[in-house]
């Protein structure tokens, strides 16, 4: 933070990932973000900038913290995506995982291939960027460990009706974000 109360983040769309990097994350099958994914990631970042004192600039490094985006096709059982907080946690910083976010792209999970406004791929981008901003899930659960369900929620309002960081549908709290057959998410 530069004393102005605004966090200036930089980001990069990865063009490659070493085998060591992939092993560190427990994933396989790197691929670059498509132009569609890049555009939707920028819009998801703008969603955060609209409600928080944070800016995002695409460049190789710099800013208060740095984020990266990449795709993977295997590993991280149960996770459609995952991300790490940039630069503030020694565990992540020394391991080289800080600020990284990864999105599952394969034949059995296609939501991240064509993210767009009002679909789960776009919601996933917004959610994972939230993790890089330091936000956690409203409850103690994680798709990478076990098979969490709404029964694991710590409080009744732990749904996407109240937080983009929740795993659980707004239907669990008698809300409905479906308009004309389309889910209206971040």
Regions flagged by a language model, labelled:
Residues 27, 145-146, 180-181:
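Generic preference for flexible, low-structure residues
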């Amino acid at each position: 933070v530069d004393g102005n109360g605004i966090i200036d983040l930089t980001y990069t769309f990865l063009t490659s990932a070493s085998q060591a990097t992939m092993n560190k994350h427990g994933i396989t099958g790197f691929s670059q973000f498509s132009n569609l994914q890049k555009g939707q990631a920028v819009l998801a970042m703008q969603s955060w900038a609209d409600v928080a004192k944070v800016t995002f600039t695409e460049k190789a490094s710099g800013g208060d913290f740095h984020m990266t985006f990449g795709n993977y096709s295997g590993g991280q059982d149960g996770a459609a995506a995952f991300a790490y907080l940039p630069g503030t946690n020694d565990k992540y910083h020394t391991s080289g995982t800080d600020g990284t976010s990864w999105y599952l792209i394969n034949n059995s999970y296609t939501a991240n291939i064509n993210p767009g406004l009002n679909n789960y791929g776009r919601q996933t981008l917004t959610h994972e960027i939230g993790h890089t901003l330091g936000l956690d899930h409203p409850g103690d659960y994680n798709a990478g460990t076990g098979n969490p369900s709404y029964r694991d929620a710590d409080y009744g309002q732990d749904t996407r009706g109240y937080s983009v960081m929740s795993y659980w549908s707004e239907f669990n709290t008698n809300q409905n974000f479906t308009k004309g057959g389309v889910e209206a998410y971040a």
